[in-house]
Swiss-Prot record:
Gene3D superfamilies: 2.40.10.310. This is Small ribosomal subunit protein eS8. The keyword Ribosomal protein applies. It comes from the Archaea. Part of the 30S ribosomal subunit. GO terms for molecular function: structural constituent of ribosome. It comes from Sulfolobus acidocaldarius (strain ATCC 33909 / DSM 639 / JCM 8929 / NBRC 15157 / NCIMB 11770). Belongs to the eukaryotic ribosomal protein eS8 family.
Amino acid sequence: MSYYQGNDSRKITGGQKGKNRDKRKYELGSPPTETKISDKDIKEKDRVAGGNFKLRLRYASYANVYDPQSKTAKKVKIISVLESPANREYARRGIIVKGTLIQTELGKAKVTSRPGQDGIINALLLRE
């Protein structure tokens, strides 16, 4: 089943609207990429509008964590998902999105990239 993002074919009253053209390819979408924690990184290459490509990160094991105190970035292992501002269920299911708080080997970090769009997890180390 496709993800159609065009106008609805129903009127406010519930009746069918008249169809004046077919669905177009640019009106199609895709399901959300729900990045989860795993042993290894698994990426998918997805063709998008304009012939461009998006790297969708399906499973992640490492994050690039930036430490603002020492001004250095390190590749560290992700231990768990603590909380997610997008959805409470995401934290329980272990899904990583932008703004998610993750537990890493260095400590707590906040995800600053969009894993489902960028194909990588960048995070900012938080100091308590």
